[in-house]
Amino acid sequence: MAAPPDLQDEPLSPANPGSQLFGGRGEGEEATPKGARPAQQDGEPAWGSGAGAGVVSSRGLCSGPARSPPVAMETASTGVAAVPDALDHSSSPTLKDGEGACYTSLISDICYPPREDSAYFTGILQKENGHITTSESPEELGTPGPSLPEVPGTEPHGLLSSDSGIEMTPAESTEVNKILADPLDQMKAEACKYIDITRPQEAKGQEEQSPGLEDKDLDFKDKDSEVSTKPEGVHAPNQPSPVEGKLIKDNLFEESTFAPYIDELSDEQHRMSLVTAPVKITLTEIGPPVMTATHETIPEKQDLCLKPSPDTVPTVTVSEPEDDSPGSVTPPSSGTEPSAAESQGKGSVSEDELIAAIKEAKGLSYETTESPRPVGQAADRPKVKARSGLPTIPSSLDQEASSAESGDSEIELVSEDPMASEDALPSGYVSFGHVSGPPPSPASPSIQYSILREEREAELDSELIIESCDASSASEESPKREQDSPPMKPGVLDAIREETSSRATEERAPSHQGPVEPDPILSFTPVTLQSRPEPSSGDGAPVPEPPKSQQQKPEEEAVSSSQSPAATEIPGPLGSDLVPPLPFFNKQKAIDLLYWRDIKQTGIVFGSFLLLLFSLTQFSVVSVVAYLALAALSATISFRIYKSVLQAVQKTDEGHPFKAYLELEITLSQEQIQKYTDCLQLYVNSTLKELRRLFLVQDLVDSLKFAVLMWLLTYVGALFNGLTLLLMAVVSMFTLPVVYVKHQAQVDQYLGLVRTHINTVVAKIQAKIPGAKRHAE
């Protein structure tokens, strides 16, 4: 049965005598559904005439060579109205089993003579304990009607099957007319036939639809709804027709949809008195077939009232609102449906709502909802959507797709006993993910929570900030998300149970016959919530905590800076930080010597250097080395003899006088030698590279400068030799630091004058050298 074109958003209304039923023709809507034949013209033979008159077969329902009768097909989705008083309560199990059942009515203008030899119509009436379930009560028909006789009926299987597993048994409408005939011989009037699409008892489920839904793709598989047709003149045209049906716990308020009439009635047929003879064709499901999830998006939001059964365990999945800012990682929801968090101004689920969901799951509060929620309540609470427990209704998949794309709050109901579907209402797997098929068994019956997407992304941003120590990179994004999502209270955090990543993977496994959601669920523990960094008062970004390695470095720098401030005044050579310390000499000792902090020690060292240098000026290097060696030996031998004589006189045994020095370890290890060699290699290599660059004139200006320096050194060498220059350097090292500390102001003034004079001379020289001026600029 093909879907009719788009339907108007209007309630059911009875037709007037001169118009089609329910206002289809009255408003000028004329259309021919797919698979139906065009309107019958005058003079054409009526459908059903002959031996096979009135036989509703699968060929006749779809398409075939036989002409279709002027039949109006109508499908209505209604809320729960009060069951008529005349309806026997013993027939209510059929209605209870088919909560939200879909009624499709075929209204024909042709009446047929009764045929005694025609086969009975199966599934006309549901017989339950000797009572009859009719589609309409006498009050609904507007005229008192007698009780209908029992009609034998069986559950047909395999005669006619559709794609959704719905079966129909063809039968003759004349038998229906004969059985349901009015005692006043009104069989010549127009008969109203019904096709009742209901579920078997094992397919019970909670069907929840929202008010104001305009279904653009009407199909017999799209909705679980009820249809009731009324005779003309019973109600006002603008009043919604009362519908038959009864729900046990939930009152659903749905919007009716209409199929336009196929045929245009003639004036003669309009003048005929119409009496509806209700006939019900029961279509049963052969089993819930496995149906793959579809990615259809319903533009309208559905507001559903979720009332779980006592044997269900809710799994509430909370997600943060989406961020449409350019800097946000999370893309906005696809489609035209706004998320519930966006409709509330980026709200989030509070503690009261979580507790309310727990109470509803335990069956502590069950309320009958006969109308949509007020605007105030809808604004205070996030809109909760539910999916039907039966996998044969594709409209639930539309709700899933729209909700999964929008990132709304999700409430999942997982049944603890999915096999007990015959004793109680089926506890289907209600979720908003792309999940369908049999409900998965929960890991445990306790309540399980997982915080999705935005909350986890905010945590990842904070962790990245801590690792990179760059608080400014996330100052615009992380605080905004933290303000949008208020922190949960400790009581709620205690109730939240940690959900592992394997659990999130199971819910989206291919065994559920559903595609994986675009955004995976990441587990989130209360410990992570408590460890969230607080935003600073400056730029609003979380204050990063420096790692331990970075905390140790400032301590080492503080130790090195606690030494003398004069250490920074003497710049070390290139790569001085790579120079390993000497065994008996380090940087601190050198500073102490140069600043005369230990006068005795500094005097001895300074005198020794002066003696050595002056000796070299008078004698050769070989003579100086020999004399120094003889002087050292004479001193040590004399001291050794003196100590030996003293011990002999005093009759003491103190041992060797240089025993402490002899036991002192002065050997260099292989590692120390390697360090000194590497340091020396660094200096040698850098010197060789610089000399090669200067002598090979890589830069003409630098080579000319080096040439001028060498020319000046020729005059210095004529006046001083190397030892004299070395002696002057040693004297300057031990005298200039002390003089500069004592007369720093005067020294700085004179140094400024000298620097200015030198710059003037250099400028004059560069002006005379070709190419030097361009290089300076």
Swiss-Prot record:
Residues 1-77, 129-182, 198-245, 293-573 are annotated as: Disordered. It comes from the Eukaryota. It is found in: Endoplasmic reticulum membrane; Golgi apparatus membrane. Residues 326-339 have a biased composition (Low complexity). It comes from Rattus norvegicus. The chain crosses the membrane at residues 604-624, 706-726. Interacts with NDRG1. Interacts with BACE1. Interacts with TMEM33. PANTHER family: RETICULON-1, RETICULON-LIKE PROTEIN. It is a multi-pass membrane protein. Inhibits amyloid precursor protein processing, probably by blocking BACE1 activity. InterPro entries: Reticulon (IPR003388), RTN1-4 (IPR046964). This is Reticulon-1. Residues 199-233, 495-510 have a biased composition (Basic and acidic residues). GO terms for biological process: brain development; endoplasmic reticulum tubular network formation; negative regulation of amyloid-beta formation; neuron differentiation. GO terms for cellular component: dendrite; endoplasmic reticulum; endoplasmic reticulum membrane; Golgi membrane; neuron projection; neuronal cell body; postsynaptic density; smooth endoplasmic reticulum. Residues 393-406, 525-534 have a biased composition (Polar residues). Pfam families: Reticulon. Residues 590-777 form the Reticulon domain. The modification Phosphoserine is found at S13, S68, S210, S241, S325, S348, S350, S485. Expressed predominantly in central and peripheral nervous system of newborn and adult rats. Low levels have been also detected in heart, adrenal gland and spleen. Expression of isoform RTN1-B is restricted to particular neuronal types. Keywords: Endoplasmic reticulum, Golgi apparatus, Membrane, Phosphoprotein, Transmembrane, Transmembrane helix. The gene is Rtn1.
